Swiss-Prot record:
Its main location: membrane. Residues 40-281 form the ABC transporter domain. The gene is pstB. CDD domains: ABC_PstB_phosphate_transporter. It is found in: Cell inner membrane. The complex is composed of two ATP-binding proteins (PstB), two transmembrane proteins (PstC and PstA) and a solute-binding protein (PstS). PANTHER family: ABC TRANSPORTER I FAMILY MEMBER 17, PHOSPHATE IMPORT ATP-BINDING PROTEIN PSTB. This is Phosphate import ATP-binding protein PstB. It comes from Granulibacter bethesdensis (strain ATCC BAA-1260 / CGDNIH1). It is a peripheral membrane protein. It catalyses: phosphate(out) + ATP + H2O = ADP + 2 phosphate(in) + H(+).
Amino acid sequence: MVSTVSQVSRTASHDAGGSAAAGLAAMAASRVMVESQPKIAVRNLDFYYGSHKALKSISLDVHERQVLGMIGPSGCGKSTLLRILNKMYALYPGQRAEGEVLLDGENVLGKDVDVNVLRSRVGMVFQKPTPFPMSIYENIAFGIRLHEKLSKAEMDERIEWSLTRAALWSEVKDRLHTAAAGMSGGQQQRLCIARTIAVKPEVILLDEPTSALDPISTLKIEELVDELKRDFTIAIVTHNMQQAARCADRVAFFYMGELVEVGTALDMFTNPREQRTQEYITGRFG
């Protein structure tokens, strides 16, 4: 593996994006990926905004207890795909999906699927932190009450568990009943992650979760993602190549509504099969 990275570093040094590509390769090579079966299987998926076809015949797997990084220029369809995985698009008239999104073999695009159950199994964290206008405690308890009836002691235990998993408990344990709006941006985003995992989903979708955060808060979120994949399947949309190399086990590159290429992070950042992938990764467009 080291020799592969060295080879890429030497080859990449001949072009303008060489040093950046070599750095991405080194980051990807440092990750340890455990092989697993697909948790979500997307098959022949087309998606429409009215008459506009935004996604074209997408087929890809999201492997269990791995991180799938989704990269590509703005408007390429990666965030659209993320919202299809837990049927968020159904909230908006005129949007429709054709094909299959199989969660443990069940097509979640079917009309008889209970979207509330689906979204408890496949949780989502958005680009901008979205704490509810209530206390830190109630931000997490709110979602739990929709799905479970817990005693006060059980609720307290679940909230401590979720805040601990989100690397936030030590920072807020003495002010749980104060307004979440008083937290920093990075803390608010970790609160949103805690709120998501509090209902014990199987999959976590992250849509550019650090784009509005400072570098220190970004690092905390990235470390958290690496920790959470031990128990959750994760898909993350990012415009940051370094973040994809640091966080993702597999990477999917999208361009103009098409899935151009998907592979391990190491393969994608050292030896992409498609010229468009190479050009995007090295910053020649995007």
